[in-house]
C-alpha cells in the first residue's frame, strides 16, 4: 500500500490507523501538503534506504520471479542484481551492470526540513540488513536529530513524553 495523497491519509485515519507511513518517493512539498490537509495524523517518513525502480507498493517483479511479495515486506531486490543489455542482433551493449539499481536514499541532511514539513517520525530501512549496519545508520541519524532538538525546543522527542 502506498500512501501519497491527503485523501488516502485521511481515509486511513478515519478507518482507525493512528500513524501513516508515507511513500518514500514524496517530495518535501508533497509531505507538507498532506500534513496541512491532515494535521492530526502522525506521518512517518522514510529517510534512509533503498529506492525501488518502481513506485512504493507497486512492484510485482519480486513476486513474479521469486514468489516473494515486495508489497508485504519480502522484496528479493531483483533490481539490485547485475544485468547485461543485449541489442536485437545479440551484441552485448553492457555486461553485468546494475542497470535497474537506483541510488539509495539518504535524507540525513534534510531532517529539519522534513520535521518542518510535518513528519513526526522517521523510518530507516533495516530489513535484510545486518545488525552493525542498522546500528551505525541509526546512531548517525540520532546524532543529527539530537542536534536539531537542542536548537529547536518545539520539537520534543517522543520518549521524553513517557512518564513511568
Which residues does each PLM region occupy?
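Carbohydrate-binding surfaces of carbohydrate-active enzymes
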Residues: 146-159
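Catalytic alpha/beta core domains of metabolic enzymes, predominantly
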Residues: 1-128, 134-137, 144-149
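Conserved small/polar residues in nucleotide/adenosyl-binding loops
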Residues: 162-164
